[in-house]
Amino acid sequence: MAKTPVRTRKRVKKQVADGMAHIHASFNNTIVTLTDRQGNALSWATAGGSGFRGSRKSTPFAAQVAADRAGAVAKEFGLKNIEVFVKGPGPGRESAIRALNAAGFKITNITDVTPIPHNGCRPPKKRRV
């Protein structure tokens, strides 16, 4: 008996005009995630995944490239206006925001959501180089 062809529906890309950009800038890497208003991820990119390894991962240029890559994929969803949430003390904070602005997104708001302990865990010991 001949097999019947399996019918699959073509996945429809949802159109999202407003969204959020979450930038996690650590000392070692930068992660850029673009989401819709509910927080469902549309696209993401990292400095390490963009071809940078080792100490080059933690540069502002690597964060800029990661933001460009995430922005290019999010453009396909029709994303225009974004609200930026920045977390962490890393060197890629500023350059990732500038790259998203240069990619053609209208930034409506920038919020720093870096977690600050109210005298929580003991921090790591100081480095001796």
UniProtKB/Swiss-Prot annotation:
The lineage of its organism: Bacteria, Pseudomonadati, Pseudomonadota, Gammaproteobacteria, Alteromonadales. One of its GO terms (molecular function) is rRNA binding. Part of the 30S ribosomal subunit. Interacts with proteins S7 and S18. Binds to IF-3. Located on the platform of the 30S subunit, it bridges several disparate RNA helices of the 16S rRNA. Forms part of the Shine-Dalgarno cleft in the 70S ribosome. InterPro entries: Ribosomal_uS11, Ribosomal_uS11_bac-type, Ribosomal_uS11_CS, Ribosomal_uS11_sf. This is Small ribosomal subunit protein uS11. It comes from the Bacteria. Keywords: Ribonucleoprotein, Ribosomal protein, RNA-binding, rRNA-binding. GO terms for cellular component: ribonucleoprotein complex; ribosome.
